[in-house]
């Protein structure tokens, strides 16, 4: 039991969760892991409440999947959820939001990446040409150093003054 507790404490290092919260998340993870493989495949991850209906569900899965394995292990699960906890700070939440847009994980949001993610959100409600105009205007406004892409610092300057990060808080317990 003590060994199990220390494993949970170790898993929780660097997160915003107490060991009791980690234990509750482990139990939730095990319920989601319907095939008891120790990892969440895409279909299991999408069974998280509110995720399947989210137009960015595939991007959320990719951001949680820190090692690019195509699935989410328990450590990745709690690391990702930590951002959404009530104890997650503004910068963590903005960093997560940035990663949703940074598809190739190069530390920048390109014109193409912004288009893809916005297309996921608006679907066919806008013509591609209209969406491209929005993307171009957004890049122009946010890109302060003129390199044609948005760095995290530029992203933070653009959206940090909004309350978007507040919508990234979930009551997990």
UniProtKB/Swiss-Prot annotation:
Q: Fetch the SMART domains from UniProt.
A: EFh (SM00054)
Q: Which GO terms describe its biological process?
A: calcineurin-mediated signaling
Task: Tell me which CDD domains the record gives.
Answer: EFh
Q: Which GO terms describe its cellular component?
A: calcineurin complex
What Gene Ontology terms describe what this protein does at the molecular function level?
Answer: calcium ion binding; calcium-dependent protein serine/threonine phosphatase regulator activity; phosphatase binding
At which positions is Ca(2+) 4 bound? 143, 145, 147, 149, 154
| Keywords assigned | Calcium, Metal-binding, Repeat
Q: Where does Ca(2+) 2 bind?
A: 65, 67, 69, 71, 76
Q: Where is the signal peptide?
A: none
Q: Which PROSITE patterns match?
A: EF_HAND_1, EF_HAND_2
Family statement: Belongs to the calcineurin regulatory subunit family.
Name the job this protein performs.
Regulatory subunit of calcineurin, a calcium-dependent, calmodulin stimulated protein phosphatase. Confers calcium sensitivity.
- Extra facts: This protein has four functional calcium-binding sites.
- What is this protein identified as? Calcineurin subunit B
Q: Which organism is it from?
A: Yarrowia lipolytica (strain CLIB 122 / E 150)
- Gene symbol here is CNB1
């Amino acid at each position: 039991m003590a060994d199990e507790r220390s494993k949970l404490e170790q898993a929780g290092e660097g997160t915003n969760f107490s060991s009791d919260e980690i234990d509750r998340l482990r139990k939730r993870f095990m319920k989601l892991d319907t095939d008891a493989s120790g990892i969440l495949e895409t279909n299991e991850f999408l069974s998280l409440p509110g995720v399947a209906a989210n137009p960015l569900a595939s991007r959320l899965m990719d951001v949680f999947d820190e090692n690019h394995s195509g699935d989410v292990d328990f450590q990745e699960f709690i690391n990702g959820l930590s951002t959404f906890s009530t104890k997650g700070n503004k910068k963590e939440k903005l960093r997560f939001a940035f990663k949703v847009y940074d598809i190739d994980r190069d530390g920048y949001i390109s014109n193409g990446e912004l288009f893809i993610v916005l297309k996921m959100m608006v679907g066919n409600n806008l013509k591609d040409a209209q969406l491209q105009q929005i993307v171009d205007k957004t890049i122009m406004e946010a890109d302060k150093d003129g390199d044609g892409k948005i760095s995290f610092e530029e992203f933070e300057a653009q959206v940090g003054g909004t309350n978007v990060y507040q919508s990234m808080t979930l009551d997990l317990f």
